[in-house]
Regions:
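Cytosolic regulatory regions of ion transport systems
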Residues: 1-178
Length: 178
């Protein structure tokens, strides 16, 4: 267990920590161990076979690498043609789409309704929130939303945006490891 969210705060548990009802737990595990864990707690696991990612930055690149290694079909929507070329060369198994990811008609035409994972990774928090809310309305897939600013995390928690990724937390966690 890496962290526990409780009552709007984040706790890094120690050996004496006790989980409470309503705690949101973040943990780190291999895919096999995570699957085993979810089976033990009788939580159904629905493997993802395809993902639609909006935003083609560094997080999208590394996430796509991981997904492709796990045989997940990846489509990345990126509006910058030069970045699309870089992604296409770096991730030849992924489908790179040069389009404005906030174009709702385009997202629907790309199969948003049938995607099993929708990931909003643009550099604009508000756009990510709106994209995720749109995806939530049109898809039963898993949702992941990147949020850069931490100031509104209590408000965002009430919006049911799926898994929220805070790059600042990820950087801190990475630095603390060493």
């Amino acid at each position: 267990v890496c962290a526990v969210e409780r009552d709007g705060g984040v706790i890094i548990p120690n050996g004496n920590f006790v989980l409470q009802t309503g705690d949101q737990v973040t943990f780190l595990a291999t895919q096999e161990k995570a699957h085993e864990f979810f089976q033990r707690i009788n939580m159904p696991v629905r493997p993802v076979r395809n993902a639609l990612i909006v935003g083609g930055g560094a997080i999208a690149y590394y996430l796509s690498q991981e997904l492709l290694e796990n045989h997940v079909r990846v489509r990345i929507v990126e509006r910058d043609p030069a970045r699309c070329n870089v992604l296409a060369e770096s991730l030849p198994e992924a489908q790179i789409l040069n389009e404005d990811g906030s174009n709702r008609d385009f997202l629907l035409s790309e199969g948003l309704e049938s995607t099993e994972a929708f990931v909003a990774l643009t550099n604009i928090d508000e756009e990510n929130v709106l994209l995720t809310l749109f995806a939530k309305k049109h898809s039963k897939g898993k949702l992941v939303t990147k949020i850069n600013r931490l100031e509104f995390d209590d408000i965002l928690a009430g919006l049911d945006l799926g898994s929220i990724v805070y790059p600042k937390y990820m950087t801190c966690d990475y630095i603390v490891q060493y």
